Amino acid sequence: MAPSNLPPVFNATSQDIEMLLAAQCHLGSKNLQVHMEPYLWKTRPDGINVINIGKTWEKIVLAARIIAAIDNPADVAVISARPYGQRAVLKFASHTGATAIAGRFTPGNFTNYITRSFKEPRLIIVTDPRTDAQAIKEASYVNIPVIALCDTDSPTEFVDVAIPTNNKGRHAIGLVWWLLAREVLRLRGTLATRETEWDVVVDLYFYRDPEAEETKEIADETKVAGAEEVGPAAIESGYVGDSWDAAAPGAAAPGAAFAAASATAGATWEAEASGDWAAESAQPNPETKW
């Protein structure tokens, strides 16, 4: 599924297309914004709008070329108020040198020069035009170009480059940011050739729930020893394999020990019982004198 509007060198590989499909980047919402119609491929019977993956790749390459054209990487601001995109923008910033704004966008970041967090970027990239509306609005006041990850129902007002994709799933958001970072590094020459594999795995860009990770660690620590952990312990204690009848080294056989003990006990009982009980009972008790 190679886009026809790109030079052959920029065409997506089959692996890139498979990753976009596996992350469900092509699944939009049931609502359709009029400006997103050119990126629509079809509408499923259940009402889900399907995005054209070829258009998604074209816009990723276009956005990467815009980012690579900026001399100072720190002049690019990547923004995500949506939790699923915060880890992705932080990783993108660390790999490309951009400035990350993860979490709540403080009003006045681009317009109020008195605030400590005042910034003057030359380009901003947002994860969702709806949740990052404040950043887009302020960028329009100071003439900052905007690149946005847009779903089929996303508002495109003041958005200069829209990357059509699913911007609600954590895998879709992480994958698009990862592809964008890889393409920027290719254009800058950090990656020698387009055939060179990037050693950063896409999983680093995916959102991870801290509470779920903590619960998993606690479960691993309190894990009860399984059957596979009993075997080595039994071998170390002197028992070989699963045979419970085998004696430990230096110990006598259980049957022989029981027979010897029984023989000794029988001889002793017979010796004690040889006395005359009648003679003992006939003896008168001595009188007690007070």
From Swiss-Prot:
Residues 269-290 are annotated as: Disordered. Signal peptide: none annotated. GO terms for biological process: ribosomal small subunit assembly; translation. One of its GO terms (molecular function) is structural constituent of ribosome. Keywords: Cytoplasm, Ribonucleoprotein, Ribosomal protein. Its main location: cytoplasm. The keyword Lipid biosynthesis does not apply. SUPFAM superfamilies: Ribosomal protein S2. It is found in: Cytoplasm. Gene3D superfamilies: Glucose-6-phosphate isomerase like protein, domain 1. One of its GO terms (cellular component) is cytosolic small ribosomal subunit. CDD domains: RPS2. Belongs to the universal ribosomal protein uS2 family. Required for the assembly and/or stability of the 40S ribosomal subunit. Required for the processing of the 20S rRNA-precursor to mature 18S rRNA in a late step of the maturation of 40S ribosomal subunits. Component of the small ribosomal subunit. Mature ribosomes consist of a small (40S) and a large (60S) subunit. The 40S subunit contains about 33 different proteins and 1 molecule of RNA (18S). The 60S subunit contains about 49 different proteins and 3 molecules of RNA (25S, 5.8S and 5S). Interacts with rps21. This is Small ribosomal subunit protein uS2. It comes from Talaromyces marneffei (strain ATCC 18224 / CBS 334.59 / QM 7333) (Penicillium marneffei). The gene is rps0.
